[in-house]
Amino acid sequence: MIRVLLAALLQAVPADSGEVHLHNIRQLTFGGQNAEAYFSRSGRQIIFQRQEADSGCDQEFVMNTDGTGLHRVSSGKGRTTCGYFFDDDRRIFYATTQHAGAACPPRPDYSTGYVWALYDYDIYVANADGQGARRITNNPRYDAEGTLSPDGTTIVFTSLRNGDLDIYTMGVDGRHLKRLTRTLGYDGGPFFSPDGKQIVYRAWHPQTAADSADYRGLIAQNLVRPVRMEIWVMDAAGSEQRQVTSLGGANFAPYFHPDGKRIIFASNHRNPRSRNFDLYLVNADGSNLEQITTNTEFDAFPMFSPDGRQLVWASNRNGKVQGETNIFIADWIEAP
C-alpha cells in the first residue's frame, strides 16, 4: 500500500513536444489550489500555499521534493501567502492576516474587472514545523511577497505602507527597513540574484492620467489590477532600476537562474486577455527570449533548485477539475 501511495505522489506527466528543457515531469499535488512553491536552501523541501477543496483560504504547507511529508506550517487562521525558507532550512517566514482574526477575509469584487486584493498581511517568522511564529512587521496595510537574500541576512518584500506598492528590504528581525522603489505603480514579486547583488521584480507604472487615477482609486480600496506588468532588475540597494522585458500583457513571477545571467518568468503576452500563461527564459539584459512551456493551460511561479538541476512551478495541466492548480517538478535540461 505504501508503495502504491508513493507511486501516486510521483505521478509522471508527459511534457508537450515543445517543452525540450523539461524532463521527467512529476505532479506533486492533486486537487485544490496550489501555488508559489519555493525550494528550501538545501533543495530537499518545498514550501507553498494551498487552498484545499473544503477550505476557503490559502495556508502554507511544506513537503519533500518527491511529494511526501506534506504538512501545514501556518496556523490555519486567516489567509497566508508567500512562504519562504531561511538559509538554514530550520526556519520559515510567510505573510498572513491571522492577527486580524481567524476568519478568511472576503474575496474582491470582480464586477469591474480582474483585481488582486491587498489584504492586511504582515510577515511572520516561525520554525520550519510552524511552531514559535512571531510577527516581524506591524503595518495596517499590505506587507507580503517576501524572499531572502543569499547570505540569509535580508528579507526583500512588497509593502503598501506608504500608500503605493513598493519594494523594501529589512533585516530578518524586521529592523533596518529601507525603501527601494518610489515610482508610482506596482513594484513587487522581488527575488535576489544568486550573488545577492541584484533584485529581479515585476512592475507596472501608469503612463497616463487615466491609468494613474484608476490605480490610485483601486489602491484606496486595497486592490490592484495586475493585467500589465513587465520584468525589471535593480541593484540590491535600489539603484540602476532597468526594464528587462517590453512584451505587453502580464509578465510576472521572475526568478534568476543559478548562473545569475538569465531570468525565468511567466507571461501571457501572446494573448493578454487569456489565462494561458507560459514560462519564458530571457537573458538579464532582455535578449534571447525563449519559451519554456507550451501547454495550453496556466503555467507560472517558476523556481530553479539551488543547483539548477530542477524546476518547480504551478500549473493547471493534468487537472481533474477545470482551473485546478497543482505543483509540478521537472529535471532541467540545459542544452537539449
For each of these PLM feature ranges, what is it?
Residues 46-47, 92, 155, 199, ...:
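Hydrophobic beta-strand positions that form the internal "hydrophobic ladder"
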Residues 24-27, 68-71, 120, 131-134, ...:
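Predominantly a core beta-strand signature of beta-propeller blades
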Residues 41-42, 87-88, 150-151, 194-195, ...:
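Residue-level detector of Asp-centered blade-edge/turn motifs that repeat once per structural unit
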Residues 30-33, 49-60, 75-80, 95-122, ...:
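A flexible loop/linker signature enriched in serine peptidases of the S9 family
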Residues 1-7:
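Sec-dependent signal peptide recognition
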Residues 13-32:
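A short helix->beta-strand "capping" segment at the edge of beta-propeller domains
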Residues 64-68, 127-131, 171-175, 235-239, ...:
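Short loop/turn segments that connect beta-strands within beta-propeller blades
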